[in-house]
Amino acid sequence: MADPEGTDGEGTGCNGWFFVETIVEKKTGDVISDDEDETATDTGSDMVDFIDTQLSICEQAEQETAQALFHAQEVQNDAQVLHLLKRKFAGGSKENSPLGEQLSVDTDLSPRLQEISLNSGHKKAKRRLFTISDSGYGCSEVEAAETQVTVNTNAENGGSVHSTQSSGGDSSDNAENVDPHCSITELKELLQASNKKAAMLAVFKDIYGLSFTDLVRNFKSDKTTCTDWVMAIFGVNPTVAEGFKTLIKPATLYAHIQCLDCKWGVLILALLRYKCGKNRLTVAKGLSTLLHVPETCMLIEPPKLRSSVAALYWYRTGISNISEVSGDTPEWIQRLTIIQHGIDDSNFDLSDMVQWAFDNDLTDESDMAFQYAQLADCNSNAAAFLKSNCQAKYLKDCAVMCRHYKRAQKRQMNMSQWIKYRCSKIDEGGDWRPIVQFLRYQGVEFISFLRALKEFLKGTPKKNCILLYGPANTGKSYFGMSFIHFLQGAIISFVNSNSHFWLEPLADTKVAMLDDATHTCWTYFDNYMRNALDGNPISIDRKHKPLLQLKCPPILLTSNIDPAKDNKWPYLESRVTVFTFPHAFPFDKNGNPVYEINDKNWKCFFERTWSRLDLHEDDEDADTEGIPFGTFKCVTGQNTRPL
């Protein structure tokens, strides 16, 4: 039997000291030494020099004590590391264990069983006696909380099959085995999840208390650019998250950043306005570089610009201590959080939209819709238009009314007033000389051209049509198109001559043009449009509308055929004024036209030749820019009281 533990018993422990003391006791009859006095009191004065208190000896003792303490700490650390290493390999299967076949279920059950085991044969499955703390690598965290059972079953062919069954352990044991590195494991689980977006949305709603989709609108394409972006970034290091608030400022005009802890690390919610438009891929790449987080761990979408709830959330959290805000607040947040704007946006006025389209010379529905929608940030009526469910109806009504007003305005003007009105819409800075130089280059006498142009603009019978004749590449179309563009004339194409409505544009224009007339076109003119070339009233068929009778506007033609030289059209010779362009149009070495003809040059040309063209301006039109009825207004004006 082994000696019992403790201090009781003879000859063991501290009792040995007392045996020695009894041996040296005085016996009867012993002679007492002269230098020993029994009656003397022991004061300990004879032990004064027994302890050496010199400095060197004390320092040596302290060093030895420190070394012993350091050694004890190292032993404890090594034991802990060894224990964790054993725990790591003990949690795996036999195939993954470095011990190979020597690792058995008995070893997992208790470390002491290995010392008394005679062999490592297969035994029946037993329960785990106790659980060992996690190694910290995360790979065996779940296994430590489960009970593993190995079952040997006989297969049909006589062999044995090893199967493992596991059941969940106690949740309190799992809470004790939490390790600081578990966030890395859970972040890996996020990366390996089948639906990463759903997992991130669930965690976001659990942390912030609202859905991420309540704050953003969805961009299906990653290439769509936007200046404002809302992002939720998962698994950010706390130190990096603090530095992100400073690093993002140089690239943004506005930054609203919130940081909260989640099971994957720090969860950052940010609303950023960049200095220039970026797409989702560019934003994700930049954030991944700054935060060292994979792009798959980010939710990036543009914010809801018309949601009062979303704007109120950014406003309320921006003034609280949970957020870090820098820069000027976006205008859409200011607009949606001001009560007065919210009241004004609820009322849409169609006349306001019609007035805007009329002032900007817009009659196309697509242009109206696009440009008016861009005013929603600064125009309350445009914002109400976007909120309406009848945008298509309002847009169609606006385009129809604008065309009616434009058509009536044009009909009220004569040619002089219309040219004056068009000149008022063109900027200054033109030069009339390139037009005159180009005519001289083509051999056209300038005085003859002015005389024909004066009769052309007045619509004089037999002088209502001008033909620019010449070979190809002589600048006929360039000269004619620039003239029509300045006067906002209409273009008719003979390709549509099979339709009854191909002349319908003549009803709403002051001047028209047909480019590149062919033999077929001249034959059609000779058969059906002699009175139109004369400048007499004609009847035009319009689609879904009754026939319209009007005086045909002046028509400018370009062609490679001179009808006056062909005997097939003898009746067109007196109705067409011909100017020949025989020379090729010149270009400089850079490919630019030598004679630049644009709206500014035509404005300067008409201002220079105003009197020669017999264009008159009434005194009452001098203050109204040529418009006989002044500035058009279709909105309710405000009454003004004189001082």
From Swiss-Prot:
It is an enzyme of class 5 (isomerase). The gene is E1. It catalyses: Couples ATP hydrolysis with the unwinding of duplex DNA by translocating in the 3'-5' direction; ATP + H2O = ADP + phosphate + H(+). InterPro entries: Helicase_SF3_DNA-vir (IPR014015), P-loop_NTPase (IPR027417), PPV_DNA_helicase_E1_C (IPR001177), PPV_DNA_helicase_E1_N (IPR014000), PPV_E1_DBD (IPR046832), PPV_E1_DBD_sf (IPR046935), Rep_E1_papillomaV (IPR016393), Znf_lg_T-Ag_D1_dom_sf (IPR037102). ATP-dependent DNA 3'-5' helicase required for initiation of viral DNA replication. It forms a complex with the viral E2 protein. The E1-E2 complex binds to the replication origin which contains binding sites for both proteins. During the initial step, a dimer of E1 interacts with a dimer of protein E2 leading to a complex that binds the viral origin of replication with high specificity. Then, a second dimer of E1 displaces the E2 dimer in an ATP-dependent manner to form the E1 tetramer. It comes from the Viruses. Belongs to the papillomaviridae E1 protein family. Disulfide bonds: none annotated. Its EC number is 5.6.2.4. Pfam families: PPV_E1_C (PF00519), PPV_E1_DBD (PF20450), PPV_E1_N (PF00524). This is Replication protein E1. Can form hexamers. Interacts with E2 protein; this interaction increases E1 DNA binding specificity. Interacts with host DNA polymerase subunit POLA2. Interacts with host single stranded DNA-binding protein RPA1. Interacts with host TOP1; this interaction stimulates the enzymatic activity of TOP1. Its main location: host cell. A motif (Nuclear localization signal) lies at residues 86-88. It is found in: Host nucleus. The modification Phosphoserine is found at residue 110. It comes from Human papillomavirus 45. A motif (Nuclear export signal) lies at residues 109-118. Residues 152-178 are annotated as: Disordered.
